[in-house]
Amino acid sequence: MIFYEKSAAQYSSYKKRMRIPLEGGESEGGYLQNFCLRDGYLGGGVGSEQVTDGSVQISALFCVGGAIAGYAPSGKLCVGSALADSGFAFTGIPDCVALPDGDGMLLSDGQTCVSVTSAGANKLTLPFRTAVFAYGRLWRTSDGVRLYYGALDDYKEAAVGRGQTGYIDSPDAKGKILRLFFVKNEILVLREYGLQKLVAHGDEEEFAFEDILSCAAVNGGSAAATQNALFWLTAEGFRVWGDAKVNGYSQFFTPHVSLDSVRGAACGDRYFLQSQYTLPDGTVAEGLGVFDAQGGGYLIPQKAEGLVSVQNGVFFTHGGKGYTVTEKGNFLGGIAHRVWQSAPTQPFGCRALLGEVCVRSKGPFLLQIKSDEGSRALCFAGGLCRKRVLLAGTVFSFRVQAEECELYALSAVFQRGEDKV
């Protein structure tokens, strides 16, 4: 095959510049399913960092300040960096609330409550299924009907009396209390069929619930919150309250999520969901979904267990080891979440020469180009850059691998080839 130089009149017929959309996703160590792609951006990825060495098998990990706690498959509570047996046990993965001073946490399964700090673990008579610290008090419930509030600035005080510990019996048409959160300086009460706000300023006799919204049956395990937003799943889809907008998050995932045994977590503008996902081809994959406010969403095909968000961290376990989610790096199994693949491109329907590529980006990345006749790998440092490729073929594909990058434009210049007569 010979490539001929053409006159100006013939030039447009034999040479073309094409914009290359990055439409598909893949991973370094396994399959990565993209739910929604952001135009001009490679999508926000996450990595993970191992916290425990696996010498003690755990099903859930909790870290607040210098305090570390692990829930073992046997139900035992293990504490400290060595995950030593605390002598306490739970009937299931406990709920966790960080202490106001940031140096520890309270863990409870609704029957047993244990305080874990850097100094060790102690049992308290403050059982809860869900709890939150707000307005100088500890708010907790075990049965979803009676809501206890602690004494001001003394959460350990158990004596019931005016100005001390008290409770509110709160039967409601929206059902039992499933979760408590403190979002945008307000106590949010997520019930079986809706969301309320607890007005708890001033005199204790004036504490009251105010309705915010009603919704379909709520999955309590999916609920998670940041300082500014609350996320949860219902039988009819995904809900958000606060600064985030529901239409900012990928809507693809909700009809494809099994609501059995899901666990949610949140950090920054990201919502994490441990669940089983039905992929577009009909296969079912167990993994961790990650969704952000810009519409990005993807499935990490690794079995994550015990997903929790505590303070400003997201933790999970895999293979009995504890991990924390990080902003950078690879996930389990070497999965890199910033790897994106274009659809096959056939510029002329016959053999062609890829002469050059032009990119405009922020941040470095590796561009790999393949054709049916060969491949090229090019490194870009960022900014506006044009590089020669000189790769022949009929069908071309483009693959971008980046740790952290925004790709604003990717285009390629092709020249059609002619057979020598």
Predicted feature locations:
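Hydrophobic or amphipathic alpha-helical targeting/insertion segments
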Residues: V97-L124
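Compositionally biased, intrinsically disordered low-complexity segments
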Residues: E5-S7, E23, A119, G163, ...
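Short hydrophobic-aromatic micro-motifs
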Residues: L106-L107, L138-R140, F231-W232, L273, ...
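Beta-sheet repeat architectures centered on beta-propellers
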Residues: M1-K76, S81, S86, F90-P100, ...
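Hydrophobic beta-strand segments that make up the repeating blades of beta-propeller
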Residues: I68, M105-L107, I187, L230
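Beta-propeller and closely related beta-pinwheel folds
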Residues: E49-Q57, G87-G92, A121-R137, T141-A266
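Short beta-strand segments and strand-loop junctions that repeat across beta-rich extracellular domains
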Residues: C78-G80, T112-V116, V145-G161, L198-A200, ...
